[in-house]
Amino acid sequence: RIGDKRMFLYMGRVATEKNVEALLRAWRLVKPEGCHLVIVGDGPLHATLQNTYSSNDVLWWGYEADLATRVALLQSAEVFVLPSLVEGLSLALLEAMASGCACVATDAGADGEVLAGGAGIVLSTQGVTTQLRTLLPVLRDQPVLTRELGRQARERVLERYTMQSNIDALERLYADVMRHEPMAA
């Protein structure tokens, strides 16, 4: 929260492939009362988008190098939105999930897989603005939903994306390989 306002957050590069403008267009169309959108990050489109989409309910944080501050921002946010058109597996998404944010991301790269099955809301990369225009009021009006999505996101990241879960998976893989007979040369 920012004061008495609920916080929606984008954290990442402000570049074409991140599709931040789709989020800003949807935000402008919906104007979610009682909420702020915080854009954390910098990039080639930062100045242009800030000039075009400047408003009292959009806060332009800029690049944040300090880890403790980034964590505090994530913990203050209720909803994390990642509207990317191109992505691998977003570290920012995993960090938001670990912080207990309700997460909304496109199906670009592995992000859709990470959120599938109830750990978040997955959007198509086609028509992101339209989808967000429908979804933002629901997230604004349903704090019980956002809390549950945040809980499930955190549970998912702790199950699958911690260092220990990756070590365990690697050990299982090695054990499976070692059980098989060596091939003759």
Segments (PLM) and residue ranges:
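Conserved donor-binding/catalytic core segment of Leloir-type glycosyltransferases
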Residues: 2-18, 24-28
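Nucleotide-activated donor-binding/catalytic signature segment of Leloir-type glycosyltransferases, i.e.
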Residues: 47-65
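Short alpha-helical donor nucleotide-sugar binding micro-motif in glycosyltransferases
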Residues: 72-77
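Aromatic "clamp/platform" in nucleotide-sugar-dependent glycosyltransferases that forms part
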Residues: 85
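Short acidic/histidine- and often glycine-rich active-site loop of Leloir-type glycosyltransferases
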Residues: 94, 107-123
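Short hydrophobic beta-strand element within catalytic cores of glycosyltransferases
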Residues: 102-105
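Conserved acidic donor-binding segment of nucleotide-sugar-dependent glycosyltransferases
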Residues: 117, 121-129, 138-143
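A short, well-ordered alpha-helix in the C-terminal region of glycosyltransferases
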Residues: 145-160, 166-172
